[in-house]
Amino acid sequence: MNNWNSITIKISREAEEAISALLIEAGSAGVEINDSADYLNHEDQFGEVLPEIEQSELVDITAYYPENMPIVELKAEIEHKIANLADYFSLTGLSVTTNNLSETNWAEAWKKYFEPARITHDLTIVPSWTKDYLATGSEKLIRLDPGMAFGTGTHPTTKMSLYALEQVLRGGETLLDVGTGSGVLSVAATYLGAAEIFAYDIDEVAVRVALENIELNPGHEKIHVSANNLLEGIDKKADVIVANILADILVLMTDDAFRLVKEEGYLIMSGIIADKADMVIASAENAGFFLETRLIQGEWNCLIFKKTENREGVIGG
């Protein structure tokens, strides 16, 4: 058995994926997320008895670190990095606490919480260590290592991105995946028929994680991963651009996205908390896109925009 230290961050829901990525980059073996919305939005289809949960706008994100890592210094470093993100999401209610987990073999024990999850009609996320799960019918298996975080496919923003890709991909497309994280959307795009995928992330750790996950799946030769800040300096024209990142970051890329999306092509934007959806819509429409579809799950929005002169069938067209 090994001893572990944990750092738990209570923060606004919209910051969940960004903070998870920050904690992984700081050396965590993985993160655990406790969100009241997961219980409140759960459909009681199988007679489960769920705990009574008080609704909150905050989530608890817990990261686990080996005991030999200097937890006091690490906590201070993480607090400093979170403070630098204040322009992107609310820090109201923020708290950062630590705990020692004596004699806990967390590095292996946490894996029991991750099981294969059917995300869409055809796409199922399977943990990399699950070897005996077999696809049935039209089911496609996306193998990921959830311990790498950066999105495992089960978060509402990622789920809706996958639904959106199913909706717009017909086969043979060139796709740009901005802020690729785990690489899950790029892998899904290969299964859905995209001919060539270019995946970008500003974080070198995310680039490494994406490459490792992509190698676990067939079709990885179609995916090209590199470090880049959004779409700056990119000149590759695309049929589809997808980005599942913070709303305040999404609005910085709409002009570049319009420049790169081919006529009749699509821009998929997810990771958008409800009260920032109008801001993202305005930014994309000002760039020249039309809103075609709006997906909503709980407080999260996923927006599908189209670059077209024919406004028939688009929202407001």
UniProtKB/Swiss-Prot annotation:
It catalyses: L-lysyl-[protein] + 3 S-adenosyl-L-methionine = N(6),N(6),N(6)-trimethyl-L-lysyl-[protein] + 3 S-adenosyl-L-homocysteine + 3 H(+). GO terms for cellular component: cytoplasm. Keywords: Cytoplasm, Methyltransferase, S-adenosyl-L-methionine, Transferase. It is found in: Cytoplasm. S-adenosyl-L-methionine binds at residues 158, 179, 201, 244. CDD domains: AdoMet_MTases. The keyword S-adenosyl-L-methionine applies. Methylates ribosomal protein L11. Belongs to the methyltransferase superfamily. PrmA family. This is Ribosomal protein L11 methyltransferase. It comes from Lactococcus lactis subsp. cremoris (strain SK11). The lineage of its organism: Bacteria, Bacillati, Bacillota, Bacilli, Lactobacillales. The gene is prmA.
